[in-house]
A protein has these predicted regions:
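Cysteine-centered catalytic environments shared across enzyme families
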Residues: 1-197, 201-256
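Short low-complexity, flexible loop/linker segments enriched in glycine and/or proline
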Residues: 234, 260-264
Length: 264
């Protein structure tokens, strides 16, 4: 039996049909909720990996019908999903406390995971600090069919090395980057975009692409001490792109005041 422990709130929503339940957090660029439900209800399991790999967006979801149950996280694991098996029962939850608080859960520490955490600050792969509880890694899903649980990788970051001419790689990177920002712009709509603009290449790229794609409603800001070079360059970049720029002065006294305030 599969037990799904999720507190429905502004983040997690339940989309229920006559044949299935879909618990979803996040959003999709590539499919509507109705399309996702229809496909997952009718798909042959041998094509499931390929379909999940076609999903685009930031999401985590659990789908359950009479044939199977799957729990999926996106390619960056923007939301976590944990799972645990006890005899013939399975428990899935985004909140590991829901699993740890089960009366029959034995809190046996995974010594390897403990060492990983002590050395790096986090566990590696699908490990948690507990022997019996696992957590999906980026690009993974777990499938339960006929009381059998199996974890799959639908996406891997490290693929075969591609040997292409430099100009081809540059063209491909340009296309991928522009396509991504077009999706972001479509999602944002008419809302204002606020960019923390520094002197670095990352934020400069973001601002430049929005300008290249004709986005007008953009506000850039920088912060720090009045004479810091990052803010000076940030202001020049914003002016060149035609975007409004705001400076937020920060000093030791303002930081100390904030850290001592009730807001912090």
């Amino acid at each position: 039996m599969v037990n799904i422990k999720i507190e429905l709130n502004k983040f997690w929503n339940l989309h229920e049909t006559r044949d299935s339940k879909l618990y979803l957090k996040g959003y999709f660029y590539s499919h509507t909720i109705y399309e996702l439900n229809d496909i997952l209800n009718s798909i042959e399991l041998e094509y499931l990996n390929e379909f999940i790999n076609s999903l685009r967006g930031n999401f985590a979801f659990i789908f359950k019908n009479s044939k199977y149950t799957i729990a999926v996280v996106d390619r960056i694991r923007s939301s976590e999903l944990n799972f645990f098996q006890y005899k013939s029962d399975f428990y899935i939850s985004p909140n590991i406390s829901s699993i740890l608080n089960l009366e029959f859960f034995k809190k046996s520490i995974d010594q390897d995971a403990l060492l990983q955490t002590a050395m790096s600050g986090y566990t590696i792969g699908d490990d948690t600090l507990y022997d019996n509880c696992k957590s999906l890694s980026a690009g993974q899903y777990v499938m339960i069919v006929d009381d059998k649980l199996e974890v799959f990788d639908y996406f891997k970051y490290f693929d075969a090395i591609s040997k292409q001419p430099y100009d081809e790689l540059k063209t491909e990177l340009t296309k991928v980057t522009l396509d991504l920002f077009k999706k972001i712009i479509k999602k944002i709509g008419d809302r204002q975009i606020v960019i923390p603009l520094s002197a670095g290449n990352d934020s400069r790229l973001v601002a430049s692409i929005f300008h290249h794609l004709g986005v007008k409603n953009v506000l850039c800001y920088s912060y720090g001490q009045k004479t810091n070079f990052e803010s000076k360059i940030s202001k020049i970049i914003a002016k060149k792109l035609g975007y409004k720029w705001v400076f937020i002065p920060v000093s030791y006294s303002t930081e100390r005041s904030f850290y001592n305030s009730n807001k912090y």
